[in-house]
Amino acid sequence: MYLQGTKQTFLENMNGTENLTTSLINNTCHDTIDEFRNQVYSTMYSVISVVGFFGNSFVLYVLIKTYHEKSAFQVYMINLAIADLLCVCTLPLRVVYYVHKGKWLFGDFLCRLTTYALYVNLYCSIFFMTAMSFFRCVAIVFPVQNINLVTQKKARFVCIGIWIFVILTSSPFLMYKSYQDEKNNTKCFEPPQNNQAKKYVLILHYVSLFFGFIIPFVTIIVCYTMIILTLLKNTMKKNMPSRRKAIGMIIVVTAAFLVSFMPYHIQRTIHLHLLHSETRPCDSVLRMQKSVVITLSLAASNCCFDPLLYFFSGGNFRRRLSTFRKHSLSSMTYVPKKKASLPEKGEEICNE
């Protein structure tokens, strides 16, 4: 029961947003969220583009400049920054689209690519964070027995696997192209135009919900629970400040994960059930549409949170930053430290 024109972005049709022309049944809902949508998206995507680009560019530059300090988590951080940069480079196109009140100006190829890039970033970020959490758990809970699992080479293979998996599983979104509406305006990021496509979107939703959110979220919770229990158990044996720092890092990472991804996936599921119910009051539908805009903006904002994750992931990145600054100021060649023993490696990984 939407008025024609209350359309949402293509990411929102993962929420089951219906074709507004075919769903105009009794014409009882005369309100739209177009103005709200255009203002929020254009503002949020502008901020995310600027902050995400400079933040991730800086982190990536520092990590590459200190690449001689080899670390498995450095590999994950670099890949996470690359995924963020690929996404934020497409967000200005979305800003232009919403500033022009839903008129696409950049051709069919960029329409497909912009839609695709946001999905790839969303789930690459989730999987990279999950991989980092898993291997951090291995390093802290089993620091000596399983130290060979947490290597730079294995991290590269994991990252390659994540890229291939996400790129292939997100490829269906490349099939959704721009089109001309009844006013001859080119549209992009809009809901599917037939019932068959809507069913396909429903299937994609549950597949991505289970494999792209539930499994990674459970993995992170289990890993961080094991880490916290291990750190608390060993508090009296080793340096308490370093243990508090590790626990604080876990809290920051978990909070960022929950703020960025959980609201979007929960809202998307609720929205699907609402749209498939027989009774859909106009005010409830409009509130749900507004919540789509808010939660989708939060999901996209993970590009801004990730640089903070790099900083709060422990002393290692801050040490890299200090090394980079000293190297830049003194123009002296950095001399790497001697190879660490297994216990030292385990402790270093705990501080990543």
UniProtKB/Swiss-Prot annotation:
Residues 65-72, 143-156, 230-245, 313-352 are cytoplasmic. Residues 1-43, 94-121, 178-208, 267-291 are extracellular. Disulfide bonds join 111-188. Glycans are attached at residues 15, 19, 26, 184. InterPro entries: CLT1_recept, Cyst_leuk_rcpt, GPCR_Rhodpsn, GPCR_Rhodpsn_7TM. The chain crosses the membrane at residues 44-64, 73-93, 122-142, 157-177, 209-229, 246-266, 292-312. One of its GO terms (cellular component) is plasma membrane. Widely expressed, with higher expression in the lung and skin, intermediate levels in the heart, kidney and stomach and lower levels in several other tissues. Isoform 1 is the most abundant form in all tested tissues. The keyword Chaperone does not apply. PROSITE patterns: G_PROTEIN_RECEP_F1_2. GO terms for biological process: calcium ion transport; cell surface receptor signaling pathway; cellular response to hypoxia; chemotaxis; establishment of localization in cell; inflammatory response to antigenic stimulus; positive regulation of angiogenesis; positive regulation of glial cell proliferation. The keyword Repressor does not apply. Keywords: Cell membrane, Disulfide bond, G-protein coupled receptor, Glycoprotein, Membrane, Receptor, Transducer, Transmembrane, Transmembrane helix. It comes from the Eukaryota. It is a multi-pass membrane protein. It is found in: Cell membrane. PANTHER family: CYSTEINYL LEUKOTRIENE RECEPTOR 1, PURINOCEPTOR-RELATED G-PROTEIN COUPLED RECEPTOR. MK-571, a selective antagonist, was shown to inhibit eosinophilia, bronchial hyperreactivity and microvascular leakage. Zafirlukast (Accolate) and pranlukast (Onon) were also shown to be selective antagonists. Receptor for cysteinyl leukotrienes mediating constriction of the microvascular smooth muscle during an inflammatory response. This response is mediated via a G-protein that activates a phosphatidylinositol-calcium second messenger system. The rank order of affinities for the leukotrienes is LTD4 >> LTE4 = LTC4 >> LTB4. Belongs to the G-protein coupled receptor 1 family. This is Cysteinyl leukotriene receptor 1. The lineage of its organism: Eukaryota, Metazoa, Chordata, Craniata, Vertebrata.
